[in-house]
C-alpha cells in the first residue's frame, strides 16, 4: 500500500510518500503525479520519511517524474530517506542522479 499527500511550500510541490513503492503501487504513484495539481509542478520534493520499501519499478516511476520535471525546466529531488531505501538509492545510483537531502527544508532550498 502507498499513501501520497502533497502540499506546496515556497513554490515547490512537496509529495509525502508513506508505505511501499513497488510494481503494485507504482500505478498509484503515477496516477497521483498525473493529477493537475501535481503534473503542473516543475519543482518537486519527494519526502521519503514514510517510505519503507522501493523496488526497481518504483525507481522507474521516480525517474519518469524527474524527467518530466526536467522537461519543464524544473527538478525532482528526495529527502528524509530511510536507511533501507537509501541503500537501494546508493546501489542503483539514483541517489546521485536525483539528489538526497536530510529534510524537506534542505530539499526545497536546493531546488528553489
Question: What are the functions of these language-model segments?
Answer:
Residues 9-10, 49, 81, 105:
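Conserved catalytic submotifs in the C-terminal HATPase_c
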Residues 7, 79, 101:
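General small-molecule cofactor/ligand-binding pocket signal
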